[in-house]
Amino acid sequence: MTTHVVLYSGGLDSTIVLDMVRRTLARMGDEVVPVYFDLRQPYSEAEIRRLDPSIQIDDRISWLGEADETSPIPIVSLRNIFMVLLCATMGNKVYFGQLHPLSESTSDGDQLFLSLMSLLLQKVASDPRHGLAYPEVFTPLSEYSKPQAVRRYLASGGRPEALLSSFSCFQPLDDTPCGECNACVNRYVALKLNSLPPGTEYIVNPESTQYYDFEFKRQATTL
């Protein structure tokens, strides 16, 4: 039996990856384990409140520290490394929702990162005393932009309702997304380019923000 471990945040990308693993990648008898890592960020409580009971919550790396608030996309340094390593102790196939570099350019999610992490894990697994079953790391969305990933998900029979209930916001007010941050705008644009409503109320209309026009034009070129 193969255990598929999915890094899950509740956003569009991880929602699509989890559905992809459950419907097309996992075989009969395989186990699929979605894991949410609580990094104790300002948005973490809002994300956790929306999680389905089937999602496993893990707080073992909550000590990593605060994100860089000066960046448009708050980044917790080294989080992907630690999350992948921990996931590899739970199963032998690990997935996370990294997009094409056109959409998200990052040094801890590209193909070189994946290759190095897989090599490291397989080196450790070569010693049977560690009890690891040759873990592999996958990013099934790495060839697609966010709107492309949404379009492929819908074309494959994915439920629009799952996308509309997704949540991505760095500065929510209680459970209401701000509408102004990069995460809100990217989610809004990806749904709009696929003729879907946002599925939520925003504090600020994303179309009135400084990011909207740029992101809409940039993401539209990928379709």
Regions found by a protein language model. Give the residues of each.
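ATP/NTP-dependent adenylation/nucleotidyl-transfer catalytic domains that generate, transfer
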Residues: 2-6, 58-64, 71-75, 133, ...
